[in-house]
Every structure is written in C-alpha cells, then in structure tokens.
C-alpha cells in the first residue's frame, strides 16, 4: 500500500490543519483526501485510499495523539475521516493523548514490496504512520469498517506521528513492506501496530483498510475492522519493533477518548513467531524485521519487552524462561517463632504428604496445628529475638496483628487517634502511644518520646517504660506473647488485652521496621527527647516531643501512609505517594477538623489532635498524622514562646500544619509539595529524621529552620529539600525524597524554585553567615546548611542531635511558621500553595533574613518580624503571642482549607483578626522600616485573607477573595483595624485572582511577618520573642491603620514593593518566588 502516500498525506494534513481540531482534521482529511493524495503524489490512489481510509480515520483519531487528525488524507477516507472525526469528537479524542513522537527521519531502504509510490518522499510528519486495519494493513475493508479501523488507526497514525515515518504493519510477524514503501521515501517504517487488546481495531500503520487482505498479511484480528477502535480495547503502537505507546479507551467521563496506558507487556495474540521475543539489539536499522540479525526492534530501554507483536525480529531469541519460576513465585509462611508444630500436626502432615487426598479424621482435623511454643516462657529476651525474627518472618501477619492490636488497644486509646493510626499502617503503634499518652499523662513528656518511638510500637512501649532499644523487646514481646503483652501493657500503664502472639509478632515486625529510623533517632535524640519532655512545656514539650516523636514517629507517626511517603518516598512512585498523601489528608483532615480545632484551641499543642491533646495524645496523634506533628511542633513552640494567645493561633496554624500533612500531598503534587510533604514530614519527620537519613531530609529543613532559629531556617531552606521551607532547599538538598518531588513539582508550585532561590538567597546570606542575627545558631547552621542542601541529613548533624532537638523545640514555631505555612500554603490549594509557598519562601527568607539580617527590618514583612526578632520593642506579650500566632495562622491558614470549610472559616475569622493583628504587628515594624511596610502589613493582612481565601479552592464558601476579605474585615474590625480589612479584601480578592505576583508578594510579606515572629519564638529567643512579638503587635495596631491605608491604596504595589524589598533582603528568594508563580 502506499504508506508513503499516506505519510505524505498525513504530513500534508498536518501541514494543513496541524490537527488543532478533530473537526478541522476531518475536514482536512475529507477535503484533503485528494489533495493529500496529490500531495502524496501517491501513484496508487486505491492503495492510498485504502491506506488513507485507515490513515484518515487513524489520523482523525490521532487528533488526540497529535495533530494527526488532519493526517487522514484518503479520498475514500473522507467519509471515514468524517466518521472518525465525529467519533473522536464524541469520544473526546481530540488531543486526548497528544503524544506525537518526533518523526524518525532515518530512511528505510525501500524494500517495500508494496510501496507503489516510493516516488513521493513523505515528509516524515509527526503523524506519518498511515492507519491500517491492524491485521489487514493492505486488506481493503469497507469504508465503514475503515472508519472504525480509522478510529483505531488514528492511534496508529499517532504512532506514525510519533514515528513520523511510514509505519510498517507487521501482522503475524510479517512486515508490511507496503508500509515500508513510505520508508523508501526516507522515513523509517514505523510499525504502528495498534494492538487492540479488547477488540479494538488493530491498525498497522501502512496498512490499508481495504476489504482484501494483503499478501503476507494474516487478518490477525479483523474484528478491528468491524469494531470501532473506541470500544473497549487498547491501541498499542510499535515502531521499529519497539513498543512506543499504548492507548486504552478512556472511561466514561474522561476528557479524552483515549488515555495512554502505562506500558504493559500485553501482547495480543498474533502470528508473530514468538510473543516472548525480547529484542536486545540497540541497533536501529532499516532492514526488514528478519533481515537484521540484531533485530529491528531495538531498544536500550525496557520497551523492548513491548516489542511489536507484529514485528518480532528475532523469534529465535526467546526471553530466557525463568528457571525456578514456580519457586520464585511461591509464598512462604514462616510460623511465628513462638508457635511450633505439634507432634500430632507433624504426623498429620506427613500422612497428608503421602496420601494427599485421604480425608483427615475428625480428631486430626480438630487438632490445633500449632502448639504454643514454650519459648514464650523464655521471657522478653528470647521473645524479643524471636520477635525480631518474626518481624522478618511474619510481615504478612503484621496487618492482621496490627488490626488486632489496634482493636485490643483501641478501648484504651483515643478512638480518633486510633482510627487515624489504624488508617495508617502504624495504627497499633499509635494506639500504644495513645494509651501510653493517656496513662503517661503524668509523664506526658515521656509520651512524646513514645511518640517518637511511636514509629515503632516497640518504640512506644519503650517510651512508656524507658527510652531504650529495650522498648523493642516489650513491643516484640507484646506482639509475640500475650503474657509479654500484658507485661508491656502494665509497663506502659495500658494493658493490652490478649493480643494474639502472632498478631503481636506481625505488629512488632511492623513496628520494628518502622522503629529502625525512629530508634536511630531515639538513640541519637533520647536525651533530647527527654529534655523536650522535661521541658514539659506543652508547646515546647509538645513541640519538641512532637519533633522527636515526629522524628521517631515520622515513619510510624506518618503511619504506614506517612511512613511510605516519607520513608519510602525515595522508593515509592509519586503517584503512590500522592495517593498515600491523600489518604493521609482524609485521615488527618478529620484529625485536623476534630483534633486540629480542639488542639488549636486547647493547646497550641497542635492543630492536629496530637498537639491538641498535649504531649500525651500528641504523640499518638502525631503518629497518626506526622504532618500534623511537625507543624504542631512549630506551633506549640511558638505558643510557649509567645503566650497562650499565640497558642491558639499556633494551634490553628498547627491545624493547617496538619494540613501540611495534607499538604504532604500537595507537596507531593507540587514543587513545594515535596516541601509540603516534607514540611509535614519535615515538620513531623524532620525532627525524627535527623537520626534517620530518610526522614532527616524532611527533618532537616525543619530542624535547621527550627534549630538555629535563624540559621536553622536558612539551613532548612538550604539543607532541607523536604521542608516546606526547603522548597528552595529542594534545590539545595535534592537528596531528600520529598525533595525530588519538590523539585518535580516545584515548577507547578514554583515553590521549589522560590525555595531554591530562597535557598540560594539564604545561601548567599548564610554564606555571609555573619549576618544571621541569631548568633551561633545561624552561623552554625549556615555553613552546614550549605552542605546540607546536598545532604540534608548532614545539616541536622550540624548541631548535636540533642541540641538540634532542643533547638527544634524552640525553633518549632518558626519551623512551623515557615515550614508549615509552606506546606499549608502549598497544600491549601495549588494557587494557595503557590501563594503560600511563596509566602513560606518569603517567610523562610524572612526568618533567614531576620536571622541573617535580623536587626535590619529591611524585609518588608520580614523586616517587621525581623525587627521584633532582633530588636523588637516589647509590648504586650499576649499581643506578641497573638501576632506570632497570627503569623503562624497566616502561614497555616491555607491549611484550614484542608480543614473543613467551617474550620477554615473559623480559622479565617480567628486568624483574620489575628492576622490583622499580626499583620498590624508585622506591619508596624515593616512600616517603620519601609514606607511600604504599611502596605506590607496590609498585604500581610491581605495575605492572611488570601491564605484564607485560597482555602476557597478547597471550600468554596466565603473563602474567596470576597469571603476572605469579609473575614479579614471582620477580623480587622474586631481588632479595630478597618483599613487592613479593606486592604485585605482587595488583596484577598487579588491573591485569589492573581495569586502569583501581588498575592505572592502579599503572602510573602505576611509570611515574612508571621514567620519572623514565629521564628523568633521558635528560637531560643522564644521568650524574648514573646515580648518582641508583643512589641510588634503593639506597633501593629498603629501600623495597622497606616498599613491598611497604605495597603489598600497600594496593596498590589506594596506587595510588589515588598517583593522588591524582599528581593533586596532575599533577593533570590522572593524574586524567584514571584518568578515561580
């Protein structure tokens, strides 16, 4: 068949219509049939036409894949093209899979048995493959069937488009040389074999959809001709024997008719000599399939496995059958170490082996297979060893065991925590932690440790009893032995009710696995954890303990989902991570709404329930939602640092931090998302990650952020790819698993880049480590952070883990503020995230700047925070706390979006006043440093509102610009700042509408304002920061009016100005942030 003509016509069609429209394409194919043929200069019009039939329909279908709809260029295929176009339009094929591969220019020697018109050199258009009825490429089919084939062929033409050369249809392993005919024109034959698995028309690229079969062609699946390509099937495209694309019919409601399928080794039944042929040759030659000893189907990648069924180059080259496949696939059951087969069971088994079909006697049947091992009597040590083995042996049992344990513990534990934990793989651990928390409420500080250890039930047990690897034993014992379990319960203070040893073992295994990083962290940070617990400040204790628990907990705290996301981020596909994050979001959303609000009001311990419940619950909650934990860390810290008033905002913030958890998803999704995820992980796990390299990535950003307060912050930015802060850090620390995600997503969220900028900026400022206002901390973190970006794990190590832990305690607020906001920001919604991310970047930048340039309140939003930080006039500590809380809330308000709408509203109302207040606070210092700071304060308020409004993305109630503005106005009115309210309103509306520049700027400024405060509180200066913040707050009120007026008038400009000002301070960070968006 005249594939060449087809290709040419396709090229022509492409030229004509670029396939913008299936309709257009159809028209082109219809009107261009002859013109295409003419263009093709095809000598055989019939062949061309039949080819074109397939091609035209194929081309029209290719609309989805590329601009190949226009490829349909057959005279006869005009009808088909129209039908195909209609079909495509109906199915939304238009560009559904617009994957047009670059044409393969290498000309194939024209051994085109069929190419009647090699004369025309087809321009290898992206859609050069002519659609052929897959199996009868040359067989001419009725046009109606051609149309059907055409729809299938469209996919083929897509392949052709990808091949952009005549495609060879190899059916039954026979090359379609007519297809190759086009190759003579200098295009490589593209075997665009559309293998329609489910009765989809299989269209070979140069195959005519004629009724008569071609010589060598076996109608492998003529059904393709009769059935519409659109109905239940898959189109597989092969080029040069290499699988290039597979399209499956999209499910109803999909935008496009065809969706690309991840490559599967689906080989439709074919006459191909060997379906298992695995072409290994990397030689791409234009020889016909069997002429090349190295095989035409070449691929260095694994696509060779998908070698075209039609074109198997080396049938003799069988993929080596796996020798022991039956053994490889066998599943082994390793009995629990503590159960042994009884003699009777062994006898029965031996008899069954000899006479498998002989029925068992009832006595035998009733006999227990396992005799309880006496080993259980050996005590914890033996059990522990056995448990460890069981961990390896009985992972399968883990799920059941975990469930059992959870159920057993559930009564003792907080249901919500239990549920959340149960939802995640570490429910039991969480439960243990919860029970421990409840029982250890006297020793809540210990509880955070358990939470750290929550990663591991053992860890939990341990924390209850002791912070030692011994906890593993109790946990293992717990899992292994009911008796041991009881002992554990007693030690934990919570009796575990008759856990099945097996279940216990599995749970222990899980916990042990989970606790490895936690244990490392625990060992490294036990003293820190103890110190945190000793700090006993709910916020500090909660924050630190959460930090530690997060550290330990990240795997377990995050729960299975979190663990997988955080721990295995490196190994888990982004999609899975996102899914897991979504699970977490749903789980933690509930926690957020329930615990978050409760926690927010209750403690500042954490928007998340873990924080809310204080240390006792917080550790389990943290476990349940590591994201929650980390942000709460920051939040609680600010709370203690600032004051109660700060606490509730901090808590609110924390809830968003929880949202961070959700934002983990966002972080996964967006560049910031890596940060977001990391921020949740980073917040939650960062602390825990210090010891654990994986977690450390996440951990570091926050840790660095938290630890040096200022230095930490920049360090986090630089060091921690995972930290929301470290979105930029992503650039700095690409090693973080999240970091990768962040980088990946950074473009979407442009958080990564901003962070990167921030990172570089931080780097620069940090490079000038002399700048960091926070003395040693900043400096210390500075240099390591530099390294840290490369190795986030290193960054935390900059400071002794204990120190880091403590610092985290204090830095938690800043970390929360910067880290959580970023996750929150990212998470709140993609736009929000961008705002937020930018804001967090600015925040980060600002905290860094505060640290780096703390005395200079240069940074607009930052400057104000910075000035409070470095030289804040002390005012009302409660006001300062409120400001800090507001800042935190501002950072986290986007989180509320993940909260429920009502929570968001609450957050907006609560935070808006706080925001207003906070922004006033921030703004007044800002105002003093900058004329724009007033605008910055207004922008901050607007950013707060915008943050609230971004939530509109999630809940469409009054969090839109107007709703946010109203909330902001109400808040402002509550705070007696009418002007900021209006400013907020414009900003709110504006950020929503223009989240990128002005909104970002606004967010950035507010974030900076908020972050510096939070950062201040987060640092050791936390107490001082209280006064600073209060100082900020008190000026804020005055500043608020100025700022409101300034902001209202120049919200955008002020935001932009802030951006410039931030640019000055965080030149890389903010501008990049803006550029990001």
From Swiss-Prot:
Q: Which residue intervals are annotated with compositional bias (Gly residues) in the record?
A: 596-607
Where do Polar residues bias regions lie? 704-713, 772-782, 837-846, 1056-1070
Q: Tell me the keywords, alphabetical order.
A: Developmental protein, DNA-binding, Nucleus, Phosphoprotein
Chain positions with Phosphoserine modification: 720, 723, 746, 753
Using the UniProt record, give the first listed, main subcellular location.
nucleus
Basic and acidic residues bias: start-end ranges: 408-439, 449-459
What is one Gene Ontology biological process annotated in the Swiss-Prot or TrEMBL record?
Answer: imaginal disc-derived wing margin morphogenesis
MF (Gene Ontology):
DNA binding; transcription corepressor activity
Name used for this protein in its record: Protein hairless
Q: Which organism is it from?
A: Drosophila melanogaster (Fruit fly)
